[in-house]
Every structure is written in C-alpha cells, then in structure tokens.
C-alpha cells in the first residue's frame, strides 16, 4: 500500500530472539526439538482419537480440535523463527507477514473459544450427566466447533484489515521473531490508535467471554462435586477437569499478560519471552497435559499398540 510519497516495503526484517551469534545454533536445536515434539504429540493425539471408537465423545472431539489448533499455531510461528537462527538477513515478505498475522489471530481466537467450549462440556458432563448424551450430541459438538472457527475467522479478518491500512515509511525492522501487532504498530508511520483500541476491545471481548464461561462452568462443577458423597466420585469428577484447568491457566494467563496491559507497561523484550511461551511452548505442553494420567488415552494407546503387534 502507498500513502502519499510513502510506499509500504515489500519485505520486513525480523530481529529474532537474539543477536548473539554463539546462541544461534543452540537455540535452533532447542526449538527444533520443541517443534518436532509439538507436531508428533499433537498429530499423534489427533490420529489416536480418530482411530479409537472409545474416544469418539464430545470431550475428545474438542481435544482433537485443540490439538489441530496447537499444531497449526506452532507451524505458523516456529519454522520462520528457526530460519532466523540460520539466516544473516532475517526477512519475511510483506504478504508473508500479513498471512502470518492473520493465521496467528485466527488460531489464538480459536483456542480461547475452544477452551471455553471445553469448560461448558465438562459442566454438562458433571452437573447434568443424565442429559449429557442428549445435550452434547456429535451434531451439536461440530456446530460449536464450526461456530467458534467462524467467529475466529471474522475476528482475524477485522484485525488484518486494520493492519493493511497502516503505512511503514520510516522502518521495516520488526523487533520480534514473528509478525505480531505491537511490534508492527511500533514501526508504523501512520496512526495506530484505532488498531490499538481494536486490540483492547476485541481481546477483552473474546478473552473475558471465554474466562467468564470457564469460571461460571467451574463454579457449578465445584458445587456439584462438593455434594458427591464418595471420595472416588469426587476424585473422578475433579480428575476430568484438572488437565483443562492447567491448560486454561497457562494459555489465558500468558495472553492476558500480553495483550490486556496498558501501552505504558509494554516492553518488547518482555513480550518476546511471553510470546515464546504461548506460541511455541504451550502447543507442546497441551497434549502432554491432556494425556498425562488420562486413563482413557492410555487405554486407547494400549489398544492401538496391541492391534499393531497382532497385525504383525
């Protein structure tokens, strides 16, 4: 885009995580292992849920979509970050930057909404167990999934449209390892007031609606579990929620820290670390969190292993 005598650059330069040449190769190896682990665990969980009939339940349909989102999320960010460790000139095309930002917002919003839907699913399962099969049918599950992806797409479209209106005349150096809004706002030569307002409003709307849904769901879950007399019943009810609560705490805690702060508290160096955590580390942790101590997933893995051994 052009504005007066200003022409938007065809490429941006990403500063990456560090300029220290001694750290480039060690960091490349660390994040390559993390990315490989992320893909293997998330795609493995997607395949396991798809192949095992015992896991064809609403809870695992949502978990399958969460794993897809995490795998896609990591793929949008990590490969380019890995390239910055090896390249002397860390460039990304203008179109590539816009597409990365669009995908990033789409997947972030999808994860917010998925975590909220998963909390509602746990609420229905624990608080209304007799009605659960009729309320959370497969058709309802897939409608919820399609709906949340549609909302995420619209949110991403609005943010990306706002970004396309900005001009970048003075600098094309993005002080980050991917194309995020705040670093791009920093180098914009046009006003970003509306863009920043949109980030706050949209972020507050989606994050707060997700958090409120999760909080209300868990208030009712706790009240229901407290009334269960048997210790085994209480343990079983809580055990289905602990992994979700861990995932929610990690993801929402980091995102709130990142995006719902005032501009005065904004620090690019601090945000690089926070961004690294929720774009690279959390997608690796989620499948481990949901699989760890999950008897149904372990049983499904045993069945798959036994079938493979029998076939051979």
UniProtKB/Swiss-Prot annotation:
Entry's localization field: Cell membrane
Cysteine pairs bridged by disulfides in the record: 97-179
Extracellular side, ranges: 1-26, 80-100, 165-205, 261-271
Keywords, comma-separated and alphabetical: Cell membrane, Disulfide bond, G-protein coupled receptor, Glycoprotein, Membrane, Olfaction, Receptor, Sensory transduction, Transducer, Transmembrane, Transmembrane helix
Keyword Transmembrane: yes
Chief localization: membrane
Positions annotated as glycosylated: 5
Membrane topology summary: Multi-pass membrane protein
Alphabetized Gene3D superfamilies for the sequence: Rhodopsin 7-helix transmembrane proteins
TM stretches of this protein: 27-49, 58-79, 101-120, 140-164, 206-226, 240-260, 272-292
The UniProt record lists the keyword Repeat: no
Function: Odorant receptor.
UniProt name for this protein: Olfactory receptor-like protein COR2
Organism of derivation: Gallus gallus
